[in-house]
Amino acid sequence: MLITTSRKPSQRTRSFCKSLVRVLNSSYINRGKMSIRDVLIKSSELGYNKIAVVSELKGNPNRIDFQDEEGKIIFSLEVTVGIPNSNASSKSRVKSESLKLQSDVPELDQLGKIMDIPKFIEGSPMENLLVIKRGDEKNKAIIQFYGSNGIETGPKIFIKEWRS
């Protein structure tokens, strides 16, 4: 999957996208003046069939739209994010090619299909995981990443709303 931003992203949004690339099997491109059509062309040149466009509100990432190769939005998340400082995230690395999905929220299971992440098999070691947990009244769900040593790493994504 190719990750990009809305035009003229803030530093925080760029940092979030780069931290996503470190935990997902994906690439990031600076959008600049590219149209979505240009981003889709670049995506297919790089061998991806989906893109994730990170939009922002008041300088912070606030929405992730997943689009297919035709530019149709297939899933949308309204989010707030926690971006770890570099010291915290360096303690654990995710092997993105070995990433598995563990979800407590059945409605968000399709994120695994969208991002080509296989499901976690019970009894397997708790490493290289994307975990979706139920949230509270403010956030419906929380996405956390666990590295190859089982320690939490990468961005924490608080999901306020989703649409498919």
PLM regions and their residue ranges:
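Phospho-regulatory, Ser/Thr- and acidic-rich intrinsically disordered linkers and terminal tails
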Residues: M1-S164
